[in-house]
Amino acid sequence: SYVFVDEDEEEEKKVSLEQVALKSTFFNNIELQVVKQHSSPLSPPPFMVGMAEVEVDTETGEVDVLDYVAVVDCGTPINPNLARVQTEGGIAQGIGMALFEDVQYTDKGKIRNNSFMQYKIPTRMDIGKIRVDFESSYEESGPFGAKSIGELVIDTPCPVLAEAIYNATGVRFRELPITPEKIAMGILKKKGTDENS
């Protein structure tokens, strides 16, 4: 397979997918990013609801996730134990995305914080208690009644934690990560606005 520079499909303006993969992976320190996606109409979406109990220090902006509860409808899980572990791992990643992970780029498009010394991810101590349950359903078009589960479990914690932090502080956050600095500044700004009202 080839990628063409323009629609003329001239031989001198094409490059193989193998060359694209090699150059982007081994000879360049810029990561590949997905810019297009496709979803099949025969693949019904899974659903998930999440709830979080958080504790927010209104002086420092520190957030402790005390308890996270998730209920997932992924059809009939083929392997319930693996589905549970995948859900717990996805929730942990989602908590990291919501509260810690801040990808920063240089002016040349390279990732600035490209090591775990600079890029904070949550530890088990940062995550709190995670409880997972599954809604019993059967998907006719899925294998053995199952639906997908992968991306759903990573996406749900961000809005759940943003709402929990809003309930604790009265401050809305619409950009991730919701860091202690952003929370503390948001609380100070809200106090100033409330005092001027």
Regions found by a protein language model. Name each.
Residues S1-S197:
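Cofactor-binding beta-sheet edge motifs in enzyme active sites
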